[in-house]
């Protein structure tokens, strides 16, 4: 999930939000995407776990500070952030 030839890495952001509803989450994701694009940060993936009242986002950026700034600008305080995450989505055939 890294851009080759750059120092970008992936960050897992967690937001704990009671009463997550799809319409509100869609609005937040749209806002995060717009702010991230303007800041040269990529929002790669979002996951919602309603039973845990948690929204997860995976961002690619040059620094943790850039991700935190994007989240703040979008109006969402980061509850937890983990640097250097990697993900593999889907299976590859052999």
Please state what every model-predicted region is.
Residues 1-38, 86-94:
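Short S/T/G/P-rich N-terminal loop/turn motif that feeds into the first structured element of a domain
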Residues 14, 44, 82:
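Residues in well-ordered beta-strands of folded domains
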Residues 19-21, 52, 63-65:
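Residues that cap or initiate secondary-structure elements
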Residues 33-55:
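Short, glycine- and small/hydrophobic-rich beta-strand elements in well-ordered beta-sheets
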Residues 42-47, 75-78, 87-92:
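Short C-terminal domain-edge/linker segments immediately following a structured domain
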Residues 58-60:
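Short hydrophobic/aromatic beta-strand micro-patches
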Residues 62-87:
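An amphipathic, aromatic/His-enriched active-site/gating alpha helix that lines ligand/cofactor pockets
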């Amino acid at each position: 999930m890294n851009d080759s030839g750059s120092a970008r890495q992936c960050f897992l952001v967690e937001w704990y939000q009671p009463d997550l509803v799809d319409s509100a989450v869609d609005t937040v994701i749209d806002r995060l995407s717009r702010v991230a694009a303007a800041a040269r940060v990529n929002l790669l993936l979002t996951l919602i776990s309603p039973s845990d009242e948690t929204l997860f986002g995976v961002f690619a950026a040059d620094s943790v500070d850039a991700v935190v700034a994007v989240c703040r600008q979008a109006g969402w305080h980061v509850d937890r952030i983990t640097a250097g995450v990697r993900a593999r989505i889907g299976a590859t055939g052999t």
